[in-house]
């Protein structure tokens, strides 16, 4: 991202936006310059958004921030506000999915169902319920 501010304005529905950023910025640990500066935007539930920019400008960092997977303070410094349906990204973790740029680098197991189960395990889903959730999740995206 550049220093240019992205602005969508207030929610027309009056509801809490799915994603809301106000002056959000992020600097990776060990870097002098922030990769994200003063990002302001609202994304409504169901809205489709294209995030476009040159390599290295912060697209993946913004998406990782929204998904709540940027790490702790030792990994970098966030400024401003970023909310997912009114909650911090860390407290909303699991409500937002993130597909990485290289799909091969994000699969660990030989079977996709095992990777889906891994996510459920990390969210604390009861072991007896994981199989049902894995099947339901794979059905939603047309995998069996």
PLM ranges: what are they?
Residues 9-38, 70-75, 88, 127:
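A short, flexible loop at the N-terminus of ABC-type nucleotide-binding domains that lies
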Residues 43-45, 91:
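Conserved hydrophobic segment flanking the Walker A/P-loop of ABC-type ATPase nucleotide-binding domains
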Residues 50, 90, 94-104, 110, ...:
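ABC nucleotide-binding domain signature
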Residues 52-54:
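The feature captures the beta-strand-to-loop junction immediately N-terminal to the Walker
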Residues 75-94:
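Conserved ABC transporter NBD signature motif
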Residues 104, 113-121, 131, 135:
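Short helical segment in ABC ATPase nucleotide-binding domains corresponding to the A-loop/adjacent helical element
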Residues 128-144:
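Conserved ABC ATPase "signature" region
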């Amino acid at each position: 991202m550049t220093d240019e501010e992205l602005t969508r304005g207030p929610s027309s529905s009056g509801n809490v936006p799915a994603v809301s950023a106000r002056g959000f910025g992020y600097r990776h640990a060990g870097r002098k310059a922030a990769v994200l500066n003063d990002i302001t935007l609202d994304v409504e539930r169901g809205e489709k958004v294209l995030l476009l920019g040159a390599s290295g400008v912060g697209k993946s960092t913004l998406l990782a921030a929204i998904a709540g997977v940027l790490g702790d303070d030792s990994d970098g410094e966030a400024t401003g506000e970023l909310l997912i349906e009114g909650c911090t990204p860390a407290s909303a973790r699991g409500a937002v999915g993130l597909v990485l740029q290289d799909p091969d680098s994000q699969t660990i197991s030989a079977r996709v169902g095992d990777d889906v189960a891994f996510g459920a395990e990390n969210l604390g889903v009861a072991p007896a319920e994981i199989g049902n959730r894995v099947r339901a999740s794979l059905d939603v995206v047309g995998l069996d």
